[in-house]
């Protein structure tokens, strides 16, 4: 495969996870380089080259479709029945029923319209209390899940909230880490917890829950209870904390590092409802890390030949900071738009795991809460930030002290 240079740092390194541009900026312009190599994997990180791979019908999202992996998966299916049950029943791992997909769109829109962050005000108000918040991430990581459950009229206590959040993280942490059986086991345990919670609620839903029309639509499509439980749990309870919670942590970090952007949003608060503004904050930093693509046919990219059967990882923090595509990539620029070719910062067309409308509605409320309470003296110190760098598909901040002044 073409030339992949060693950066001298692991892709799992905390500093590389937080500040990848510092390592990549010198090789964006090197024409003889296709990507970088780390931890036994090859990564593409330029915008145009990665976009060509994303939109190629011959590049499937997979760690490698070969006999070894098939045998490994067969063993996992026997040893980890909850994971196998989820994959068997969730349409996100197969062809979706288009009518049910449309019903999901209606459900997402309803939740986005009905969601209330009024009860979250005490969490946002902590930004006004002065002193130092040692780990505000703990406060905001489960907040989106809390709002989602309340909007769906699903009862929960603090234990449920923590279990659902950590279970979703366990599922996500196993993605792209197919050879790490410890993570597969964690995924299985997490999916068991999510399944148990959904089964305990599925037959006792509040009459006004927006889940009721979704379930009815599923029945009309011929889906059974197991498929509906797997799809609801798999799409939303495994993803909402990272898509909104973890990305909110990165957005907060970006705002605290870019005083001009922070002031602009405080002076023009209506901007937090603008999708392009939210997408620009996500372009600057979000939770997506690397997703693999297998080449089902040979492909040539800028003179580099990638052979059939080979696998590369698309490194999204690099794609989103490519200075040959994004002017002044380290700067937050609210004049950028994300239609047309600019729409791949998550992997394709405003795509997010929980749906574009729901993501935008939740993030708009999160950003608004930050801006209403952050004092002008607030700051962070990068050296104090801690990350869980062992994730392959995700970037995860685990601790970020905020000095409020």
Report each predicted region and the residues it spans.
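Cytochrome P450
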Residues: 1-405
């Amino acid at each position: 495969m073409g030339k992949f240079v060693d950066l001298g740092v692991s892709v799992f390194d905390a500093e590389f996870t937080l500040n990848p541009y510092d390592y990549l900026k010198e090789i964006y312009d090197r024409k003889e380089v296709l990507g970088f190599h780390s931890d036994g994997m090859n990564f593409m990180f330029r915008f145009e080259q990665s976009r060509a791979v994303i939109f190629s019908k011959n590049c499937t999202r997979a760690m490698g479709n070969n006999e070894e992996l098939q045998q490994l998966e067969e063993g996992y299916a026997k040893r980890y029945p909850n994971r196998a049950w989820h994959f068997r029943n969730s349409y996100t791992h197969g062809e979706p029923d288009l009518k049910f997909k449309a019903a999901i769109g209606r459900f997402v829109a309803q939740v986005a319209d009905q969601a209330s962050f009024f009860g979250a005000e005490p969490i946002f108000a902590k930004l006004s209390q002065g002193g130092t918040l040692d780990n505000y991430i703990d406060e905001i990581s489960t907040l989106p899940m809390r709002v989602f459950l309340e909007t769906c009229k699903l009862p929960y206590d603090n234990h449920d909230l923590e279990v659902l959040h950590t279970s979703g993280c366990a599922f996500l942490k196993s993605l792209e880490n197919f050879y790490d059986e410890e993570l597969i086991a964690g995924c299985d345990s997490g999916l068991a917890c999510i399944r148990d919670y959904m089964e305990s609620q599925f037959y006792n839903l509040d009459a006004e829950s927006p889940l009721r029309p979704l379930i009815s639509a599923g029945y009309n499509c011929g889906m059974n209870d197991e498929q509906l439980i797997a799809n609801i749990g798999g799409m939303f309870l495994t993803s909402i904390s990272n898509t909104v919670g973890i990305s909110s942590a990165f957005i907060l970090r970006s705002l605290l590092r870019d005083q001009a952007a922070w002031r602009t949003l405080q002076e023009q608060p209506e901007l937090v409802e603008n999708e392009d503004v939210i997408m620009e904050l996500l372009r600057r930093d979000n939770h997506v890390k690397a997703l693999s693509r297998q080449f089902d046919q040979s492909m040539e990219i800028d003179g580099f030949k990638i052979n059939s059967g080979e696998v590369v990882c698309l490194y999204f923090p690099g794609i989103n900071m490519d200075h040959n595509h994004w002017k002044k990539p380290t700067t937050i620029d609210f004049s950028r738009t994300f239609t047309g070719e600019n729409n791949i910062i998550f992997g394709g067309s405003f795509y997010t795991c929980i749906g574009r409308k729901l993501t935008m509605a939740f993030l708009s409320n999160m950003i608004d809460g930050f801006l209403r309470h952050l004092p002008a003296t607030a700051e962070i110190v990068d050296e104090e930030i801690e990350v869980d760098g062992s994730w392959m598909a995700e970037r995860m901040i685990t601790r970020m002290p905020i000095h409020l002044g």
